[in-house]
Amino acid sequence: LKNVTPLQMEKYQSAPFRAPMIIILTTQITDHPKVPKIEQMLSTATAAENILLALHAKNYAGIWRTGKFAFNKKIAEYLNLTPDHEVIGYLYVGTPTGTHKKIPQLDVDKFVTHWSE
């Protein structure tokens, strides 16, 4: 990292301790005539979403994070990942504190377009 303030460095150094467990999401990218790189990465993303759903079902909390360190080659080296692996994010896992956040009801018509009737 370049041009990092002391406050930013403190934030980065404390990030791994925000939760009692971190699941590092990696994808092994292989050349495949029928499965492009993006689909290989999205399959990992799909697995991560299912992990988050399972955590919630078991009354745990989880959040997906990325940021500078998710895509930093030095982190991949530190984790001893081979060059064909990419970190795509981190799942921070723990026990929820407080109550569930109330999510406002959205007007679906603002986000959905119907092409036919």
Specify the residue positions occupied by each region the protein language model found.
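Short secondary-structure boundary segments
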Residues: 27, 66-67, 95
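GST superfamily/GST-like fold recognition
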Residues: 39, 60-74
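Short hydrophobic alpha-helices that are characteristic scaffold elements of the AMP-binding
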Residues: 53-57
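Short, electropositive alpha-helical surface patch
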Residues: 75-88
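C-terminal helix-cap and adjacent tail motif
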Residues: 87-117
